[in-house]
Amino acid sequence: MKDLVPAWIDGALRPVGKLEAHQRGLRHKAVSVFVMRGPETLIQRRALDKYHTPGLWANTCCTHPLWDESPADCAVRRLREELGITGLYPAHRDRIEYRADVGNGLIEHEVVDLFIAEAPANLKVAPNPEEVAEVKWVDLYELNAQVKRRPERYTPWLRIYLAEHSERIFGTVATS
């Protein structure tokens, strides 16, 4: 059931096409991963041909589990597919819900399983150009300051995570 994500319709979880979920603003499952290196987090700039939020900076990895996939398996799979990261098994941190307009008539209404992992010193990152335009490591406090200065450069969900859920994700408040 590739490209079918778990979404709630009339109170029941059903497989729905990812684009349809965004067009209809359906509440659906998602996964977000933050890979850390001490006080820094790895962020990605989304590929320019993504159908929503192209070219914007996001957390390490943000995606939707397949219909029959666990959030933990999804996190590992998408780290590999988007960033070429293998051998890293992020820990489940929390679950949050948000709703955001992502442009072009599309809505993200996600119930997100949040994962976090500490990068080993020898972590190799090889971004898939179909998914990721570039990556960089950035200090969490500096990232928060950058998001406040230029919010239009960042995805709505990253802005929400930092502003409203920092302590739940990182165990600290990401303030500048």
Curated annotation (Swiss-Prot):
<dbReference type="InterPro" id="IPR056375">
    <property type="entry name" value="Idi_bact"/>
</dbReference>
<dbReference type="GO" id="GO:0004452">
    <property type="term" value="F:isopentenyl-diphosphate delta-isomerase activity"/>
</dbReference>
<feature type="binding site">
    <location>
        <position position="110"/>
    </location>
    <ligand>
        <name>Mn(2+)</name>
    </ligand>
</feature>
<keyword id="KW-0460">Magnesium</keyword>
<keyword id="KW-0413">Isomerase</keyword>
<dbReference type="GO" id="GO:0015995">
    <property type="term" value="P:chlorophyll biosynthetic process"/>
</dbReference>
<keyword id="KW-0479">Metal-binding</keyword>
<keyword id="KW-0963">Cytoplasm</keyword>
<dbReference type="Pfam" id="PF00293">
    <property type="entry name" value="NUDIX"/>
</dbReference>
<dbReference type="InterPro" id="IPR000086">
    <property type="entry name" value="NUDIX_hydrolase_dom"/>
</dbReference>
<protein>
    <recommendedName>
        <fullName>Isopentenyl-diphosphate Delta-isomerase</fullName>
        <ecNumber>5.3.3.2</ecNumber>
    </recommendedName>
</protein>
<feature type="binding site">
    <location>
        <position position="108"/>
    </location>
    <ligand>
        <name>Mn(2+)</name>
    </ligand>
</feature>
<keyword id="KW-0149">Chlorophyll biosynthesis</keyword>
<dbReference type="InterPro" id="IPR015797">
    <property type="entry name" value="NUDIX_hydrolase-like_dom_sf"/>
</dbReference>
<feature type="binding site">
    <location>
        <position position="28"/>
    </location>
    <ligand>
        <name>Mn(2+)</name>
    </ligand>
</feature>
<dbReference type="GO" id="GO:0046872">
    <property type="term" value="F:metal ion binding"/>
</dbReference>
<comment type="similarity">
    <text>Belongs to the IPP isomerase type 1 family.</text>
</comment>
<feature type="binding site">
    <location>
        <position position="64"/>
    </location>
    <ligand>
        <name>Mn(2+)</name>
    </ligand>
</feature>
<feature type="active site">
    <location>
        <position position="110"/>
    </location>
</feature>
<comment type="pathway">
    <text>Isoprenoid biosynthesis; dimethylallyl diphosphate biosynthesis; dimethylallyl diphosphate from isopentenyl diphosphate: step 1/1.</text>
</comment>
<dbReference type="InterPro" id="IPR011876">
    <property type="entry name" value="IsopentenylPP_isomerase_typ1"/>
</dbReference>
<keyword id="KW-0602">Photosynthesis</keyword>
<dbReference type="GO" id="GO:0015979">
    <property type="term" value="P:photosynthesis"/>
</dbReference>
<keyword id="KW-0414">Isoprene biosynthesis</keyword>
<feature type="active site">
    <location>
        <position position="62"/>
    </location>
</feature>
<comment type="function">
    <text>Catalyzes the 1,3-allylic rearrangement of the homoallylic substrate isopentenyl (IPP) to its highly electrophilic allylic isomer, dimethylallyl diphosphate (DMAPP).</text>
</comment>
<dbReference type="GO" id="GO:0005737">
    <property type="term" value="C:cytoplasm"/>
</dbReference>
<dbReference type="GO" id="GO:0009240">
    <property type="term" value="P:isopentenyl diphosphate biosynthetic process"/>
</dbReference>
<keyword id="KW-0464">Manganese</keyword>
<feature type="domain" description="Nudix hydrolase">
    <location>
        <begin position="26"/>
        <end position="160"/>
    </location>
</feature>
<comment type="pathway">
    <text>Porphyrin-containing compound metabolism; chlorophyll biosynthesis.</text>
</comment>
<feature type="binding site">
    <location>
        <position position="82"/>
    </location>
    <ligand>
        <name>Mg(2+)</name>
    </ligand>
</feature>
<feature type="binding site">
    <location>
        <position position="22"/>
    </location>
    <ligand>
        <name>Mn(2+)</name>
    </ligand>
</feature>
<dbReference type="GO" id="GO:0050992">
    <property type="term" value="P:dimethylallyl diphosphate biosynthetic process"/>
</dbReference>
